[in-house]
A protein has these predicted regions:
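Conserved eukaryotic protein kinase-like
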Residues: 1-217
Length: 217
């Protein structure tokens, strides 16, 4: 893809730093892609990507998100639409805790990984940063407890985002969605279609709050 992957742009390798509307657009595009895989529309039965992460979100010339690398994808056969027992594969930092402890792969395993990517979009940090101390390497563990605290939430916002590009209300809504996606129990997480709807609302809330127009795509 012409613009590389999402992690490149979040960690300063890409040619430009993304503002908040661009990040919301990418989150929404990725959510739609996962929702499509989960819906049975692609091949007639649900598909779990199993390795969704920021390096597998590619950006085209218009900064639209395209999901890549389906090498670990798993079909959920008829009669097993909720879960399938599978060897634990994926990328450290994006693993669904329930999947790693039980070996049962579900659509919600992708939702957890999607939540991690949402946190990367919000903070500009990596899912795992080995340059940090042992207790601060895992992004989810580092920020999960303050995602719904508006006062502390401000400290998590990527400083490379222009302050005029976001509203605190949209940030809070986005952080709340991310916090629910990375809940330990898979049954407590939203579905990908629900994520799509909530991100559309976050996008519109940000546009309305800023008083400007921006094409959602």
């Amino acid at each position: 893809m012409q613009k590389g992957n999402l992690q490149d742009h979040l960690n300063g390798i890409g040619e430009t730093k993304m503002d908040w509307p661009s990040r919301l657009k990418l989150a929404l595009g990725a959510a739609r892609g996962l929702a499509y895989l989960h819906s049975s529309s692609a091949v007639g039965i649900p598909i779990v990507h199993r390795d969704f992460k920021s390096t597998n979100v590619l950006l085209n010339a218009n900064f639209e998100a395209k999901i890549s690398d389906f090498g670990l994808a798993k079909l959920l056969p008829e009669g097993q639409e909720t879960s399938v027992t599978a060897r634990v594969l994926g990328t450290f930092g994006y693993f669904d805790p329930e999947y790693t402890s039980t070996g049962k792969l579900t659509l919600q395993s992708d939702v957890y990984a999607f939540g991690v990517v949402l946190l990367e979009l919000l903070t500009g940090r990596r899912a795992v940063d080995i340059n940090q101390g042992p207790n601060d390497q895992n992004l989810v563990l580092q920020v999960r407890h303050i995602l719904n605290d508006r006062k502390k939430l401000r400290k998590l916002i990527d400083p490379d985002m222009g302050r005029n590009s976001y509203t605190i209300e949209s940030i809070a809504m986005f952080a709340n969605l991310a916090s629910r996606c990375v809940r330990v129990e898979s049954g407590d997480r939203p579905s990908m279609p629900e994520c799509v709807k909530e991100l559309q609302l976050v996008f519109c809330t940000n546009v309305k709050g800023r008083g400007v127009g921006f094409r959602m795509g």
